[in-house]
Amino acid sequence: MADYVLVEVGGIKDIEPGTQIAVKSKFSNLHKFFCSLYSLFSWEKYYYHHGIYLDDSQVAHFSGTNKRDAKPCKCDILQFFNGGDGNEKKLYRVEYTENVEVLSLEETLRKVEKILVEPSNWPGYQLIKNNCESFARWLKTGEHWSAQAAIAIGDIKIRPLVD
């Protein structure tokens, strides 16, 4: 299970720089191959795209025009929303459970600055091991993994192939 909750916020005015954020996105935004595999990944048809709010409506996230050129980058909040499903314009703050050690806002921002200077130091995209959530989580906690991917793998293992 996820060791965090997503808390809907009214907008960026309610978020401090260094906060991990997320927007709802469709699986079809990941790769066209996954469109045919919806039911294997989740009971739902979406995931949450994660990033770190910087300031002045800027977000650090792991993205690209396609997954091959995905890398740590900075965009404005509207571009970050466009990575979402296009219909839902809700913004969520990621709040980790108390058993997860969370870095300070300042330390998170230092990590963001460092990786944005040398984005090639971050490994390439891989749906399960290296995605937007694992990137944002690493910036916020120092841990490099994705709860969404772990849950999806669990669903594949226990879900019946035929309903």
Descriptions of predicted regions:
Residues M1-D163:
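Cysteine-nucleophile amide-bond enzymes
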